[in-house]
Amino acid sequence: MRPEGVETRTGTSGFTAAPLPLAQEEQARADMYGLVARLLLAPPDDALMADLASLGGAGAGDNTLRSAAADQPLERAWLALSLAARQIDGAAARDEFAELFVSTSIPTINPYGSLYLAGFLHEKPLAALRTDLAGLGLARRSGVLETEDHLGALCETMRRMILGGDGASRQPLARQQAFFEVHIATWSGACLDHLRQADGARFYASVADFIAAYFEIERAAFDVASDFAFD
């Protein structure tokens, strides 16, 4: 997923300034949201599985997991995801994705905010989300089947809010926080619990743990930023 800059106009001369460089930690956040979106929106291809398997380090295994510090849940979840990717081949991971997320009737996992918040698909939470997306200059691309309240699509939106690009501006941290708290934090925990506990979830149980750990880091970071924000 290629990060894209945004251009801003300053003054009255029509001068177009290059965007300020993105801080390393912000690029890392965008990359994490991009990974979550990729894992939830489409079955993992062999290249993605190989990348995940390599991130734990050569020969990493249970000893590595046990040695991870108890106060670093994201690190433990990351290592566990890498280990899970080494323990399953790409075809089996794709079969698992299909078993969990794809069905001719009702899939095992329906990661849509409207369903969790209102009990049905295409309800008021989706309408409210679309209003907020319009305010950000974002909209679902034509031909995309998933609605905007799919958890993967919401993570892609967070990535775009951090990076900007394609006509959308980078958003300040306070606006990112508001979007996260309203459209993701309110229901993603229950959804990830369902994914973790679903029959047939092996690799994707580790995916759920990883996403939950990352969201908790985001929530804590937003809280700290709010504490230091100026009125």
Residue ranges and their predicted role:
Residues 1-231:
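Surface/interface-facing alpha-helical segments and adjacent flexible terminal/loop regions used
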